């Protein structure tokens, strides 16, 4: 979800389903136009991540802090309108799923009634036995409070929603660059996102 997958069709064969994550109708239109023009392909489905999602967010930091982002329902309406034309062009349905802040059965029903074809849920299941993350990592979600969640600037250049762990409260020197993100400058970023994710899943939430 960190950025626009404009070249995604280049990396998969025609039998592999491709599905972009978007945060607006504008982003959906840009991606689908690019795929149609350059690859003569379209999305098999689309996932909308609203401003309440965890991780990287496709909104401006000030919009997130001031709570002025478009609602998930409004974005859904815009994306469904964009998708119509491409469904007609390619003669197949493009289901639209929504994510971000969906937590209960009532939340799911509300979005289905608003026109979504389904929902995506991630954070809800981190504390389950089936999730293979460490117990230390899970405990941040199980015991965390609303005040512990902050909007931070990620090394990929986008704002994100994260728990303010001891790790997030200090700058970590980068010892090795994995070159996982072309736009990442190890001299200016506060920490290495790849190493941080590996450490967190393994239970080292301090580093």
Protein language model features and the residues they cover:
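Conserved active-site-proximal phosphate/metal-binding subdomains
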Residues: 53-97, 103-207
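Short catalytic-loop micro-motif centered on adjacent basic/acidic residues
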Residues: 19-20, 96-98
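Active-site entrance/lid segments in N-terminal catalytic domains of soluble metabolic enzymes
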Residues: 1-89
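Charged, low-complexity surface patches
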Residues: 1, 100-101
């Amino acid at each position: 979800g960190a950025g626009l997958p404009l070249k995604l069709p280049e990396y998969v064969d025609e039998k592999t389903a491709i599905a972009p994550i978007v945060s607006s109708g504008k982003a959906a239109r840009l991606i689908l136009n690019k795929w149609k023009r350059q690859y003569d392909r379209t999305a098999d489905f689309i996932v909308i991540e609203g401003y309440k999602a965890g991780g990287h967010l496709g909104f401006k930091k000030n919009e997130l802090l001031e709570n002025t982002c478009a609602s998930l329902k409004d974005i859904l309406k815009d994306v469904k309108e964009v998708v119509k034309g491409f469904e007609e062009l390619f003669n197949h349905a493009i289901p639209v799923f929504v994510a971000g802040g969906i937590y209960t059965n009532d939340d799911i029903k509300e979005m289905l009634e608003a026109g979504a074809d389904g929902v995506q849920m991630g954070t809800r299941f981190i504390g389950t036995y089936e999730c293979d993350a460490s117990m230390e990592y899970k405990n941040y979600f199980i015991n965390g409070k609303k005040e512990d969640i902050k909007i931070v600037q990620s090394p990929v250049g986008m704002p994100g929603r994260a728990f303010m762990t001891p790790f997030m409260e200090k700058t970590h020197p980068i010892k090795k660059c994995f070159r996982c993100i072309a736009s990442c400058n190890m001299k200016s970023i506060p920490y290495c996102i790849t190493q941080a994710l590996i450490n967190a899943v393994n239970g080292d939430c301090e580093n």
